[in-house]
Structures are given as structure tokens and as C-alpha cells.
Amino acid sequence: MESAEIARRWLAFFEKRDHVVVPSTPLVADDPELLFVVAGMQPFKPYFRGDAPAPWPRATSVQKVLRTPDIDEVGKTTRHATFFHMCGNFSFGDYFKETAIPLAWELLTTPVADGGYGFAPDRLWVTVYTDDDEAADIWHRVVGLPVDRIQRRGMADNFWSMGVPGPCGPCSEIYYDRGPEFGVGGGPVANEERYLEVWNLVFMQYERGPGGAKDNYPILGELPAKNIDTGMGLERMAAILQGVDNIYEIDTTRPILDKAAELTGQRYGSGGQNDVRLRMVADHIRAITMLVNDGVVPSNEERGYVLRRLMRRVVRAMRLLGAREPTMHELVATAIAVFTPQYPELSRNAERIFAVADGEEASFFSTLAAGTARFEAAVREAGGGVLSGEQAFVLHDTYGFPIDLTLEMAAEQGVTVDEEGFRALMAEQRRRAKEDAERRKTGAADRAAYRAAAELLGRPVEFTGYTERSGEAVVRGLLVDGAAVPAAHAGQRVEVVLDRTPFYAEGGGQLPDHGVLEFAAGRIDVDDVQQPLPGLIVHRGRVADGEITVGETVLARIDVDRRWAISRSHTATHMVHKAFREFLGDTAAQAGSENAPGRFRFDFTNPSAVPPSVLGEVEERVNDLLLHDLEVTAQIMRQQEAIASGAIAMFGEKYGDQVRVISIGDWSRELCGGTHVPHTGHLGVIKIVSESSIGAGVRRIEALVGLDAYRYLAREAVLVSQLAEQLKAPADELPDRIAGMLARLRDAEKELEKLRQARLLAEAPRLAAARVDVGGLAVVAARVDGDGVDADGLRLLATDLRQRLGGSAVVVLAGVAGGRPVVVAAVGSEALARGVKAGELVGVAAKRLGGGGGGRPDFAQGGGTNPAAVDDAVSAALDAVRAQVG
């Protein structure tokens, strides 16, 4: 019975018994206490706790679930998985044990022809909580289960909770006896490999408190009603009904496992560590595909870290299995094909899923080999003892190894890791990074000098720039080369602290004001303004004339044109942010920005590239609002009041109790301390010029505003006019005209490539005739020259020769393509049986070329950096064949 049919029967059975079918929620938990959905009941948690009234008295679902506490056991046992489906039926104060137990028994034992799962009653066992006599009595008296197949267990096994504060209760688990071939008898208390848990009935009636161990945690009291929460693992049920040994061999997992075996040249079922790795890869790929589909992207924190860890475990496992090229794309494609019938959105989101998976694999693949070598060297240094925290830190910082991966690899080698030392170094790195960022903002002076200046000032610098463009101020401090001085003279770089200023200090993505500080004897040209400490604004510049002294009065005057240009950019950023939220949803949250004169960039969260059509809609939306000349206003209010009014706060930003809210008409409201124009009409025009990725799940647009945008559009118009003249076509026909030219060019290139390959394949008869007999094998080891030589051409020629020479063929070809040497090897079935492997031959040849390579036993490819060694590489490969079979 296919997994989809098992799920369909589940939902149909309970729907007929007045349960409402509820679709699965995404894996991302809407729960502050959990990263992911870890149980089928989790979406219903508020109803169990009485926090909200249940919309229905009964419900049923097939819920996607992700659990990683037992990640190290995945692939090693027959039952552990990270991603799986939990079939559940739920009662919110409607029925309890007396109904839940018979319903479960009915579905399990009803014949397949009648819509059930057709379990033989004598193969089923149950466990109940130690003192749950009521459940035991129902199993025996109502269902008719013999007493000797009802076993009792303690809190650790038969009292269920999610592991965090929330609903909990005693449970009764149903087990299937797979037979004596899976081990000793005696029921689930004796052997959980033979007796496989298929269904857990939780009698949800208590509230769990925080803390405590799995077998002893606090119970705060009873829930408002007695509820039922049951969970049947779809994958475990499929293993039983499909007659396979474990959950990795069912219809929704085995295709992925087989693809991993195919990509690595392995054969599943031979036992040993490779089987474990193949099972682990199959499981993790399922989880990866579903996580990315549900919006998770790789990162170093929380959900993203879990995804990254899963991905990097797959990459490493595939490499250990023999893969030398990226494989994630094909593995994920297999998972998408498997699950699309149940989840059509996978097909729609395929390109986004591929992009995330391929990008993360490429990132890790580039450092994996070097990182593994570094790890092995560290293990040798440890001498079977402890891998230092410093070594683990280097693996993390330089090679991208999550600490969990290092711990796993170390355990395989029988080595422990100094985790405490590693975490101390990580904390130190974060501290230094924070200080470096602050130092970049603070310039030459250290923080002690700034603290002294702030203490001397005695109060925050008064910022007048929201309403003033110039004004008198008193010099309260001067710093030269990081030290406080009483005066600074012409030619010196100086940092000036004033008691009040119209200059805006860089912050919130807005670049600082420029301008001048004029005094009786001269002036200072200000080219940077920073706020190294809260309330302390520092003006940096060069004394152009005269000598400035502490206590002197200056006229602080900003560059008004620059301020206006930056303000236009800042207002434009707010508008673009709001428009992206309109077209992409609230997930398009601001992740950073830079507002400069005439241009701005805006970073926002989004799992994939924004389609050009959406960029066009965003651009049209904001420019339309410029024509409406909306008023831009600022208002100071309490933070809670601002958020309640709908104002958007930037994620990760810290705000005080009093905040400044910028409103653009009634359309946009954001918390912001920057400067803005009074009306949107002042912006003129906004033009988005690019959209790109700056990290997993984060996109960046670059845009122009005002005259800069106009000049860009004018240049574009000139270019279009020139192209139209060159191609003798109207502007609106240019895309089709250019597309036609490119198509013809591609066709010509394909024909040229065919001619090159044909010329190269014409060498096959000559090379075949020149074969060498080595122990009965037909060996062609040759250098190939000509303008058709490249990796593709050599692969075609090697394949052709192998077909010509039959099972005894051993073909090694090398040449120079684009100044770099390439080597390929192809081996026939008879030669394979005699121990000749293409990967080993390529390895020998590539070593002479100063490089490396790999592939399948019957076909492999490599390269190097030394084209002068091609002949030597071919000879070395021939010698290797002779050594093997000669």
C-alpha cells in the first residue's frame, strides 16, 4: 500500500466519524518555544490548553513533522528519521479513552478491502502508563486484547509531552510484532526492533511545567478538558504495509536512497557504513526539501542552522560514498518528484529549492576537502585524545564546519572535542567583531577618549538637523590622532564635539552629512559625522584655515544639496520597502539599507530572486505615489503605541521607549530616526537598476532617485536609439530581433561543435587500431590534440572507444583544453571485474598533472595545472593498468 493511500485511508476513516480534515501546517512552528513542528498536535496546542476555543470538537490531519534530537541515530536504526508525517486524530473535550482506543483498533484491524489497514490482531501489542488501569481495562475488556499483550511502562516511555511546557498526559502505544527474524520475543519492553511502534494514543489531560527530566517533570495541574491526541507515524506504517525492513526503503524514501547510490556508484544492501550513509542521505534530503519549501534558508542561527547542518551532513556523506561532483540538485529533484503528488507547491517552488540547495552545497563543497584534511591532521595531533577548541574553531571559521559536524567526525575517530574551548573562542570572535565595527565608526580615538569627551560634555549633543540646516554651536572637545587636544591648526585632521549640531551622524542606513564649521579665524571641512557613543556626535574633517580651540563658537553649516539628495533616497527606501511588502508579503522584511546622494540600496528577506515582473510592479507603484505628492510627516510616540498603530520596526534593531515614526500619507509607517523630504513629489522619479542575492534568503536592490534616476533613463533611451539604428528596427521590435540573432548564433555554435566532435570522433578507428594488449585487456592510453579537444569531446571519444573495444576495454585519454590539461578514463565490464577502476586511473594521471579527479568505477574525469605533463600522465596510467593485470 503506497504512502499516499495510507494517508488517504486515515483521513477518510476519521472524516466518516465526524472529524474535520485539517491540512498540514508548514514545518516552521508558530510557537515561541519551538523552532519546528515536532508533533501532529502542535498546531492544535492552543485548543488543548484552553487558550482559544476549538473550531470543531474533532479533527484529523496528516502533519509534516521535523525532529533532530536523534539526528545521530538516523540511518543506523530502522526507525529514526528527522522528517516524517504524523497521522493524527484529535478530540477537544469531546471523547476520551473509551472512544479513542476502539477507534484505533478498528482502523488497524479492518480488512484492506473494507478501507482499513488489515493488521492481524494477534500481531499487535500495546503499552500503557504504569498506573493507567482505565486504559488497560478498555484494551482488555472492550477491545479483547489478551492481558499478556498489554505491558506497562513508566513516565519516560508512556507519559507524553513535547519536551517543553504545555499539554501532556499518559499514553498508550500500539506495537506491531514483525516476527522472530527481527529478534527475541517478549513484547516492546524487551525489543523495540522486533516490535515496531505504529500508533501512540495520548490522553491529554494535564499541563506540564518547565524543567525536569524526561522521566520526572512537574505537572502543574489538569487542562480545562480531557482531550485526545493520537499520532501514527506514516513512514513506519508504510514500512509494515509495504513489507520492507525499515522506513528508508518505503516508496517515498527508497527512490532518494537509490539516486544517492547511483550517483556514488554504491550498491545498497551490502551492509556496513555505506548503507548507513545512504539511509541518512535519503532521510536528510527529504527534510531539506521540505524545509526550504516552507521558507527556511541556511544560516548560522536557529532554524537556518538546523537546515545548514542537515545539508552539510549530506555533502560530507556523499563525498565519503565516492561523489566528487555536486549531487544535491539531483537528490532534491528526486525528492520533489516523489512528493509533488501530495504537495503540488513543491513543483511550483522547485527553482527556489534548487537555488538554495545548490548554493549551500557549492559553498561547503569548495572547502570540504581542505577542511577534512585539516581535521585529519588535527586528529593525528590529538593522538586519540582531545581535539582542541582552537582546532574546532579553525574548522568552523575557515572551512565552514558546524561544531556538530566536527563532533560527529571526531566521534567516528574515537576522539573528543574541547567544546568549552571552542565556544569561548566563538564568544571572543563575536566580541572582537563588535568592537571592530565600533572602531570603524569611531576612527582613530579609542572608546576611553570618547567617554572622556562625553563626560566633559555632561549631556547628549543636541541634534537640531530635523528643523535647521545651520546654527551656532560651542566647541566642547577636540581630538587629534585619538587624543584630546586644546586646539587644532590648519592641515590637521580633527574630530570636533559640539554642544549642538544640525549635522546628521551616520546611522539607520543613512550616510552622514557633509559641510563646514566656520569660526573667526578659519574653517573646518567636515567629511564624516559619527556617533561612537550614545548621545555623542563627532564631526570629522580637516582644518582648512586658522586654528580652532575648545570653547570657541562656530557656525555649523551642512551641505544642503547633499542632505536633500540623501533625504530623497531615504524616503524612497521607505516607499520601496512598503511596496515590496505589498507584492511579496510581510516576509519581505528590511535586512539593511544604504541611503546615499541620488542612490540607495535596500536589502530584504526573500527566499528567491524577485521576478522582473514584480520589480516592474514595485517600481510602477512607488512612482505612481510620487505623482500623488503624499505628505511625509514625523511624530514622536511611545514604542508600543507606534507598533500598535501599524508602524514597521526593523528586525533586530533596538528602540527606546520613545520612538520617531515616519508616515508617508496613510500608506506607510516606519520607525525611523533619519531625515526625509516633506512630500513624495520631491523625489522626482525612482528607478530600480538591479536585484541580486547577498546571502541565503536575503536579496538586494540598487536604485536611483531624482536627477540620477532621470540621467540613467536618458542614457538608456540613447542606447535603445543606437541599437534601433544599428539593427534597423523600431525600439519595440528590438527584443525579438536580438533574440532571433542570438538563436541563429547558438545554432551556428552548435553546428560548429558538432563538426569539432565529428573530427575528434574520426580519431576513434585509428586509436582503436593502436590499442595495446595488457593481460588480455584492450588498452588505449593516448594523448589527443586538436581544436575539438575539451572535456566533453574527450568523454565522447572515450565512450565511443569503449563501445568499439567491448568489455575488455580500458581507455585513458588526455589533452589540453584552454591551456589546462584534462584526462578521462572509461573501463569495460570485463576490465572492471579484473579490478581496473576508472577513478583510480584518473587519480594516477591527474597526480602527474598537478591536480585531481574522480568519478564512477567505469567512468571518471580529472585535470590539473601542468599541461607539459600530459604525456607523462598517459604513461603513468598505462603503467598502472599493467601493474594491476599485467
From Swiss-Prot:
<feature type="binding site">
    <location>
        <position position="672"/>
    </location>
    <ligand>
        <name>Zn(2+)</name>
    </ligand>
</feature>
<comment type="function">
    <text>Catalyzes the attachment of alanine to tRNA(Ala) in a two-step reaction: alanine is first activated by ATP to form Ala-AMP and then transferred to the acceptor end of tRNA(Ala). Also edits incorrectly charged Ser-tRNA(Ala) and Gly-tRNA(Ala) via its editing domain.</text>
</comment>
<keyword id="KW-0648">Protein biosynthesis</keyword>
<dbReference type="InterPro" id="IPR002318">
    <property type="entry name" value="Ala-tRNA-lgiase_IIc"/>
</dbReference>
<dbReference type="GO" id="GO:0000049">
    <property type="term" value="F:tRNA binding"/>
</dbReference>
<dbReference type="InterPro" id="IPR018162">
    <property type="entry name" value="Ala-tRNA-ligase_IIc_anticod-bd"/>
</dbReference>
<dbReference type="InterPro" id="IPR045864">
    <property type="entry name" value="aa-tRNA-synth_II/BPL/LPL"/>
</dbReference>
<keyword id="KW-0067">ATP-binding</keyword>
<dbReference type="GO" id="GO:0004813">
    <property type="term" value="F:alanine-tRNA ligase activity"/>
</dbReference>
<dbReference type="InterPro" id="IPR018163">
    <property type="entry name" value="Thr/Ala-tRNA-synth_IIc_edit"/>
</dbReference>
<dbReference type="GO" id="GO:0008270">
    <property type="term" value="F:zinc ion binding"/>
</dbReference>
<dbReference type="InterPro" id="IPR003156">
    <property type="entry name" value="DHHA1_dom"/>
</dbReference>
<dbReference type="Pfam" id="PF02272">
    <property type="entry name" value="DHHA1"/>
</dbReference>
<keyword id="KW-0820">tRNA-binding</keyword>
<keyword id="KW-0436">Ligase</keyword>
<keyword id="KW-0547">Nucleotide-binding</keyword>
<keyword id="KW-0862">Zinc</keyword>
<dbReference type="InterPro" id="IPR050058">
    <property type="entry name" value="Ala-tRNA_ligase"/>
</dbReference>
<dbReference type="Pfam" id="PF07973">
    <property type="entry name" value="tRNA_SAD"/>
</dbReference>
<dbReference type="GO" id="GO:0005524">
    <property type="term" value="F:ATP binding"/>
</dbReference>
<dbReference type="InterPro" id="IPR018165">
    <property type="entry name" value="Ala-tRNA-synth_IIc_core"/>
</dbReference>
<dbReference type="GO" id="GO:0002161">
    <property type="term" value="F:aminoacyl-tRNA deacylase activity"/>
</dbReference>
<dbReference type="InterPro" id="IPR012947">
    <property type="entry name" value="tRNA_SAD"/>
</dbReference>
<feature type="binding site">
    <location>
        <position position="574"/>
    </location>
    <ligand>
        <name>Zn(2+)</name>
    </ligand>
</feature>
<keyword id="KW-0963">Cytoplasm</keyword>
<keyword id="KW-0479">Metal-binding</keyword>
<feature type="binding site">
    <location>
        <position position="676"/>
    </location>
    <ligand>
        <name>Zn(2+)</name>
    </ligand>
</feature>
<feature type="binding site">
    <location>
        <position position="570"/>
    </location>
    <ligand>
        <name>Zn(2+)</name>
    </ligand>
</feature>
<dbReference type="GO" id="GO:0005829">
    <property type="term" value="C:cytosol"/>
</dbReference>
<dbReference type="InterPro" id="IPR023033">
    <property type="entry name" value="Ala_tRNA_ligase_euk/bac"/>
</dbReference>
<keyword id="KW-0030">Aminoacyl-tRNA synthetase</keyword>
<dbReference type="InterPro" id="IPR009000">
    <property type="entry name" value="Transl_B-barrel_sf"/>
</dbReference>
<dbReference type="Pfam" id="PF01411">
    <property type="entry name" value="tRNA-synt_2c"/>
</dbReference>
<comment type="similarity">
    <text>Belongs to the class-II aminoacyl-tRNA synthetase family.</text>
</comment>
<dbReference type="InterPro" id="IPR018164">
    <property type="entry name" value="Ala-tRNA-synth_IIc_N"/>
</dbReference>
<dbReference type="GO" id="GO:0006419">
    <property type="term" value="P:alanyl-tRNA aminoacylation"/>
</dbReference>
<protein>
    <recommendedName>
        <fullName>Alanine--tRNA ligase</fullName>
        <ecNumber>6.1.1.7</ecNumber>
    </recommendedName>
</protein>
<keyword id="KW-0694">RNA-binding</keyword>
